[in-house]
């Protein structure tokens, strides 16, 4: 009888931490609610500043003039990279070709800012478990990206949702390394960012790859690291080769 009583006491002791953990996770989910209103307001403000002010006051930088000229020139004749100089990605020039730097371009920039804020918040919240700090990081992000886009860095801005989406999957792995899910999607997202801003995306890929390498070496997950590399390469190639073939055709 005393043995059974001891088992019941141990069972209760084991349940208490579990119930406390569930309660804490529930509280965390409530405190880490997505600051959607903040993201929408900041995205609208940044879009107005970075696109409306340069056009209305004729303050467009040399990079902005060059990018929009490339989009206009594609309507005339020739091909990008061969007949016209271009340092940005193919999808970026395709967007400027379709939108011609007008209202539709502003819509795409606004959507990119909303998606970038969402994925950045989710990444920071996953790594820190602090919704308030993640929200503050989102505010800093919008302040920094205002200066970036105001100087003509539209391509990098449009690549950020893809890069942050990839980083959110990496953050999920770092917080729970018991699974290797999502690495093909990481490759797909990185390829999307590459075809908007190649140089910025390559720098981002190098930093994330170094971080994953250090993490896997520190946790002795050598086989997992090799598998992750193959999965990312597969996802990247699924976007890279068809798009590169189109640009060369």
Q: Predicted regions span which residues?
A:
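Start-transfer (signal-anchor) and selected internal transmembrane alpha helices
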Residues: 1-51, 232-233
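Extracytoplasmic catalytic/substrate-binding loops of multi-pass membrane glycan-assembly enzymes
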Residues: 55-70, 80-95
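Loop-to-helix entry region of an early transmembrane alpha helix in multi-pass inner-membrane enzymes
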Residues: 86, 90, 94, 100-118
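Transmembrane-helix signature of polytopic, membrane-embedded enzymes
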Residues: 111, 117-147, 160-161
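Membrane-interface transmembrane helices that cradle and orient dolichyl/undecaprenyl
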Residues: 125-130, 164-185, 218-219
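Short acidic/glycine- and proline-prone juxtamembrane loop motifs at membrane-interface regions
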Residues: 149-159
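Membrane-interface alpha helices of multi-pass inner-membrane proteins
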Residues: 182-198, 204-205, 209
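Perimembrane helix-loop-helix junctions
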Residues: 203-235
């Amino acid at each position: 009888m005393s043995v059974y009583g001891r088992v019941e006491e141990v069972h209760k002791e084991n349940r208490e931490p579990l119930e406390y953990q569930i309660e804490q996770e529930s509280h965390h989910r409530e405190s880490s609610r997505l600051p959607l209103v903040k993201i929408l307001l900041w995205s609208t403000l940044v879009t107005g500043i970075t696109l409306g002010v340069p056009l209305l006051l004729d303050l467009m930088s040399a990079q902005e003039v060059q990018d929009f000229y490339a989009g206009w020139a594609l309507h005339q004749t020739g091909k990008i990279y061969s007949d016209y100089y271009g340092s940005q990605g193919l999808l970026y020039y395709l967007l400027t070709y379709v939108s011609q730097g007008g209202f539709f371009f502003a819509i795409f920039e606004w959507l990119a800012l909303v998606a970038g804020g969402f994925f950045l918040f989710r990444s920071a919240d996953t790594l820190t478990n602090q919704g308030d700090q993640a929200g503050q990081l989102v505010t800093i992000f919008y302040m920094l990206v205002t200066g970036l886009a105001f100087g003509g860095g539209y391509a990098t801005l449009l690549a950020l949702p893809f890069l942050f989406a990839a980083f959110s999957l990496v953050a999920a792995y770092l917080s729970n390394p018991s699974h290797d899910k999502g690495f093909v999607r990481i490759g797909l997202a990185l390829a999307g960012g590459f075809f908007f801003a190649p140089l910025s995306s390559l720098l981002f890929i190098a930093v994330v790859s170094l971080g994953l390498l250090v993490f896997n070496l520190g946790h002795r997950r050598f086989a997992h690291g090799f598998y992750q590399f193959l999965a990312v390469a597969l996802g990247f190639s699924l976007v890279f080769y068809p798009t590169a073939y189109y640009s060369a055709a």
